[in-house]
Amino acid sequence: AHGIKDAGSMHLFWQAARLLLRENSAPIRSMGRISVRPRTYQLVPLLMALRLDPVRLLIADDVGVGKTIEAALIARELWDRGEIRRLAVLCPPYLCDQWAKELSEKFHFQPVVVNSATVGLLEREVPHERSVYSHFPVQVLSIDFVKRERNKYLFLQHAPELVIVDEVHGATPAGGRERHLRYELVRALADDPRRHLLLLTATPHSGVPQAFQRLLGLLDREFESWDPSTWTEEQRIRLARHFVQRTRKDIAATWEGAPLFPEREVRYEGYHLSPEYRALYEAAFRYAREVVRRSEGLAEVRRRMRWWAALTLLRSVMSSPRSAQSALERRGVPLEEEEALLELA
């Protein structure tokens, strides 16, 4: 009240106090600390989470529905209720900055990004007796950085109360060594029965039933032994408490009575290549065909790597002149080295 000098200031002070009291008594406390207005359907995962202890949710909504907002809402609510004091997001490297921006700008967290490029700078801010993983309360981590043996156990030792795993379909054991390492990391996190865990993906089922069961097993060990083809009604009801999946079509048809997503209009336009651009494309096509021809006789994995490299080159060349220039400059990397990079991707 020290700064109140007139009736206008007093009115603002009273309004602020009233809103603060209303917020603390409301069933959802986080609404006063976010800078985004959630859609009604985006509150469903939050309401589901408030019925669980610990919170274990697989959010498998369609692309564009807002899984990031849904997960961050849960994190903000648990934080404001005092149920968590530390938070980690595990995601692919290319999503780290996007997650940090969303948490900072829309949900008033102060995250740090932890990956191979930032860890050295972060370590300079940490007292000697602590680690990066224990010092910063809100972290966005590259899952491919943390899954490495030298980082994994230190992270697990100091893992926070809530962990969000984005693109979790990339952390199922089916699909090679890299996926298996990610799965082992998330499995170790899930083994703590007190930990809150949010799993996000738009593609929970890749067509491999065992991989889907392993994914469900991260929510509850018992789910892993359930065969989806023989689920009982009781099992479906129990799983439904932990699993939400909506398509854009589902939401557009059943929520809020107005179109939520813009209608997609498809129109094809012809594009005439200049003589120089056509010559470039034909040269790139000949090169790509030679790459595929030279892959004959190689091991299956290396052959597929070269096919993808050839297709990526052609798509880049057809995209734009600048994209073509960038792709052709990368051709200075030997194919063997490029294959190694693709395996790490």
Feature-to-residue mapping (PLM):
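P-loop (Walker A) phosphate-binding loop of NTP-binding proteins
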Residues: 62, 92, 203
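Extended, hydrophobic alpha-helical segments in both membrane/secreted and soluble proteins
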Residues: 59, 65-67, 71, 75, ...
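SF2 helicase/translocase NTPase motor core
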Residues: 3-47, 54, 67-72, 76-189, ...
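Short hydrophobic/aromatic beta-strand immediately N-terminal to the Walker A/P-loop
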Residues: 57-60, 88, 198-199
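Short, locally clustered residues in the helix-turn-helix/winged-helix DNA-binding domain
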Residues: 50-51, 285
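Inter-lobe coupling linker of SF2 helicases/translocases
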Residues: 128-129, 135, 139-160, 172-195, ...
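Conserved G/P- and acidic residue-centered "switch" motifs that form tight phosphate/ATP-binding loops
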Residues: 64, 166, 201
